Amino acid sequence: VNAEIIHFDIDRGTMVSRYIDNGITLDIAALKDEAVLNRTGHAFRQLHDCGQAFSGEFELFQQIDQYLSVLNELGVELPSGYTEVQKDAERLRTALTSHPLPNRPCHCDPMVENCVDNGKKVFIIDFEYAGNNDPMWDLGDLSVEGDFTEEQEYIFMTAYFGHEPTPFDVGRMVMYKAMCDLLWTLWGVVQHANNNPVDDFWTYAVDRLNRCRTLMSSAEFPKHLSAVQRGPNE
């Protein structure tokens, strides 16, 4: 799944990986290609089905609670409307935890640029945030980062599952699309509070929140939430 690791020093935190010949770092435009989407779906399925486990867990709701605690201690104001969206998201928390999937080894930060395509397969790189997690998180987060259309999501998920995704699978992926934007909203506010100079993280956080709110208020969202609430066998 990853580029071959040639050397890793756990004490220094340094790693050397083999160069990916003919590798192209993916971007939003590249993922509009059906063949690339198929290879990407296969890559994430290979990761999730590898049979190994990371040493740490990626706990979405614990992370949200931790970020909120940090921001409360810092006395940082949240973007306008965040509290209302957070309250509304409790429905998602209840639905997702009512029918949990077994945790799998997940990337947890599937930026489009963390995927490298050599024309034959897609490699997934940069496992800084990796942990054991609901595999639908990776699919939902990549959909957000790749600005997928519904058609792209269908192609990607069909490649991932090897068959047409069920309403439960699609619904779960959509729930994580909303939740990843909610989580990264808080992450952005933390970066802003710490005066991270790399980017305008306040604007980043506001944009994430607005996208989350737009998705959760869309006409199709209740259908997806209902599919998750009913469970995988309905």
Locations of the language-model features?
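ATP-binding pocket architecture of kinase catalytic cores
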Residues: V1-F61, Y67-T83
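Active-site acidic catalytic loop and adjacent metal/ATP-binding pocket
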Residues: I5, R91-L139
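A general structural signal marking secondary-structure boundaries and capping sites
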Residues: I24, F44-Q52, L96, G146, ...
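Glycine-rich, phosphate-binding/catalytic loops in enzymes
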Residues: E34, F123, G140-L142, A159, ...
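Charged catalytic carboxylate motif
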Residues: R39, A43, E84, D88, ...
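An alpha-helical support segment within catalytic cores of ATP-dependent transferases
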Residues: D49-C108, N118-G119, T158, P165-P167, ...
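ATP/Mg2+ or Mg2+-diphosphate-binding catalytic cores
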Residues: E73-V76, S80, W187-E234
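Active-site activation/catalytic loop segments of kinase-like enzymes and analogous catalytic loops
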Residues: M136-F168, A178-N196, R211
